[in-house]
């Protein structure tokens, strides 16, 4: 009612999805347009993304691109990251395409010139994986370290993953522990994974479950999946043991 842009975007999503209230696509569209006319850059980015396929606004990629491009030209690093990851879909881009080259350039600009922490993390992951850009462990470490220096909790887990991919599980554990100590859910979830398989540490399912629970509490979805798999295995084992007991009784 008071025209707070982030709240308008949230309300537009509720209206567009029919969540918590009656669906109103036109009302959602009007709120998004109103948000784009404000000076609240974060809300404008969020509103622009709703015009991409899958958003609550009527699909209008041109409008989304135009809004984000305008913000990029003004030096908005969040818009650079949004354009690279959402418009260019950098995670799924093929190597050496215009999309991958432009996306990497935007992320590097956001990371180096504007110290954007998300850009640092994405670049570290992309250089570590080598699917979109040629694998470069040195650059992966460099961007992870930049994120650590910028006090990004997830960066410790990102650094751990780099060493895990190199096969240096003991060093990976060191980094996961550093992230876990500051309650980074991703690092805690990865610690649980390492303990569950005995990678770089002595296998300890009790510790694995403990770390997964902490990670789930701190928002790590993968840890929640690991916990569910662990519970399913326990149920299956219990059911098998009981079936064996029943067989022995009948003999």
At which residue positions do the language-model features occur?
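Terminal, low-structured helical/coil segments at or just beyond the last alpha-helical repeat
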Residues: 216-251
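Short helix-capping/linker turns of helical repeat alpha-solenoids
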Residues: 1-5, 17-19, 37-44, 53-55, ...
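Hydrophobic face of amphipathic alpha-helices that form TPR/SEL1-like repeat modules
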Residues: 10-17, 47-53, 85-91, 122-129, ...
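TPR/TPR-like (Sel1-like) alpha-helical repeat modules
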Residues: 203-221
């Amino acid at each position: 009612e008071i025209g707070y842009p982030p709240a308008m975007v949230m309300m537009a999503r509720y209206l567009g999805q029919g969540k918590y209230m009656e669906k109103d696509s036109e009302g959602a569209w009007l709120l998004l347009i109103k948000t784009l006319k404000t000076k609240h850059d974060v809300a404008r980015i969020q509103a622009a993304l709703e015009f991409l396929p899958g958003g609550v606004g009527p699909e209008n990629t041109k409008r989304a691109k135009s809004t984000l491009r305008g913000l990029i030209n003004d030096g908005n690093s969040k818009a650079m990251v949004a354009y690279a990851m959402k418009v260019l879909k950098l995670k799924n881009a093929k190597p050496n395409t215009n999309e991958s080259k432009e996306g990497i350039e935007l992320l590097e600009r956001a990371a180096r010139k504007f110290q954007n922490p998300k850009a640092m993390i994405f670049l570290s992951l992309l250089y570590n994986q080598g699917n979109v850009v040629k694998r470069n462990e040195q650059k992966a470490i460099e961007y992870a370290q930049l994120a650590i220096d910028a006090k990004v909790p997830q960066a410790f887990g990102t650094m751990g993953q780099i060493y895990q991919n190199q096969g240096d599980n003991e060093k990976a554990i060191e980094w996961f522990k550093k992230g876990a100590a500051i309650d980074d859910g991703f690092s805690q979830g990865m610690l649980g994974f390492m303990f569950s398989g005995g990678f770089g540490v002595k296998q300890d399912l009790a510790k694995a479950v403990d770390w997964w629970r902490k990670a789930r509490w701190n928002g790590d979805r993968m840890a929640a999946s690991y916990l569910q798999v662990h519970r399913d295995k326990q149920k299956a084992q219990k059911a098998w043991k009981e079936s064996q007991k029943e067989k022995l009784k009948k003999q």
